[in-house]
Amino acid sequence: MTVLAPWALWEKTKDVMVLEQQYQSMCTWIAAIPENMKRHRHLCDPVVLQFAVAVRESNPWAVMTAYHKINGVHCSEDPRLIRDIPRSEWKYDGLVLCDWWGIYSTSELINAGMDLEMPGPTDWRCKILAWATRSRKVSIETIDSSVRRVLKLVNRVLAAQSEPVKDSDTEKNRALLRETTAVPVVLLKKNEANVLPLVKDSKTRYALIGDHWKNPAVAGDDSSEVTPYYVSTPYSAFVEAVGEDSFICAMGCYSHKFAPLLYSTITQPGSDAHGMLLEFFNKDPNGSSDAELLYTTTTEKTDLKFADSLPPDTVPEYTSSGSAPSRGSRWGCAGWIREAVEIARQVDIPVILTGLSADYEYEGIDRKSLGLPGRVDELIERVTEANPKTIIITEAGTATTMPWADKTPTVIHSWFGRQETGHGIVDILFGDVNPSGRLPLTFPRNLEVPPVYESDPKHIMTISVSLKNTGQCPGAEIVQVYVKDVSSSVQRPRKELKSFKKVHLAPGENMKIEVTS
């Protein structure tokens, strides 16, 4: 989370510097913190720049370190990330605090410049810090520097509390939010069917397909969850633009998280036959029932943290965060998809609005796949086949795969637009705002496309080749791997030997050889 200047006056720049994985990020009590291996150049060029802009231009009051390690050192105790880069290079004079329970030492933290342990009461200071001072691992001068920065933040907050609260829900701010929602929208695929911009007349008939028209994704969840003054839905904004008589609505299918759909992998009890066993009870009970209570709740939101493991013979049954602890399967979608297809044939231009939501994008979790939820991909393919002028709009804060992209003429990607989501999307559709945004991340064609060799802690890449002995005698061969840096800034050989492997093959033998570099 980076607060980009000049929009930040009092915000903390969170998670310095690199956090590419949220899975187990809160498990600070076990040795399961993810570790990122970053070369210094890779760290400084694409990663540090975004934080440098926020710190230099907006001068935030505090920055926060991430949980994990970079090249073997925890971010919260890395002097390069806390002292050398922000304070020496950027001249940052504010506070540095850790993410909740995100520290793992005492003297290393203080000496690196970590000022504040969160939350309180502290676990790694007090008596431990006193012993570190007595043993001369931490100097009094270093502690005094951190104390001054903490007091500086306290004085800043006290001064801000005395100022009157200003009403931010003004017409000027609404117009600004509307603009900042529409401008970053990305036109992923050109207007091949020449349907954009849409026209505001009574002759053109539209179909609004997808659950995001009336229930849009306005923001993520957890730490990014903020209650807005209002929410402009795309449906209401479309009504403002052309009226209710110019379009037909269709659900198509849900993209929000519910019980899983009934797929062919579900089998009947006690057999391998596909389907489910249903039991209907049409008789009213005569008296009180001794039926088992399946589910009860007293809160709307609960977090469960497990710091232990289950016995090997125990099958765990639980649900992910944000879901009610109930089990079952969901029927439907097939009829809604058929309805959407029929409606798409009847209108001039169908517009599908779907994507992810706060059900899938929130702090402390990774998505299990890059695909769109449920049967959304099927909905898009079938509607596009029924009407080639279909416009696809996806809402998401992260990348999604689009297996239907080659079959659709127009693809638009909208980010989470907060309270002006609806107006921002409709402004793009009718040409009031040009979709001039660009992707800050890669949208892979499928999950197999992104290279994963750089994710290996040792930066290992394996190359596979097939080798066959076509002769009549046993033989040996050395497989060699040469590389060439096509964009090196310094003079290097045209070919560099990086790895080799010697193999022995019998006559006619065909072998698959893996060479690791």
From Swiss-Prot:
- Name the catalytic site residues: D99
Per UniProt, which keywords does this protein have?
A: Carbohydrate metabolism, Cellulose degradation, Glycoprotein, Glycosidase, Hydrolase, Polysaccharide degradation, Secreted
Protein name, entry field:
Probable beta-glucosidase O
Q: Which InterPro entries match?
A: Cellulose_deg_GH3, Fn3-like, Glyco_hydro_3_C, Glyco_hydro_3_C_sf, Glyco_hydro_3_N, Glyco_hydro_3_N_sf, Glycoside_hydrolase_SF, Ig-like_fold
Naming one, the record's GO cellular component terms include: extracellular region
* Residues that carry a glycan: N286
Q: Does the keyword Zinc apply?
A: no
Question: Pfam families recorded for this chain?
Answer: Fn3-like (PF14310), Glyco_hydro_3 (PF00933), Glyco_hydro_3_C (PF01915)
The free-text function statement in the UniProt record for this protein reads: Beta-glucosidases are one of a number of cellulolytic enzymes involved in the degradation of cellulosic biomass. Catalyzes the last step releasing glucose from the inhibitory cellobiose.
Catalysed reaction per UniProt?
Hydrolysis of terminal, non-reducing beta-D-glucosyl residues with release of beta-D-glucose
Q: In which pathway does it act?
A: Glycan metabolism; cellulose degradation
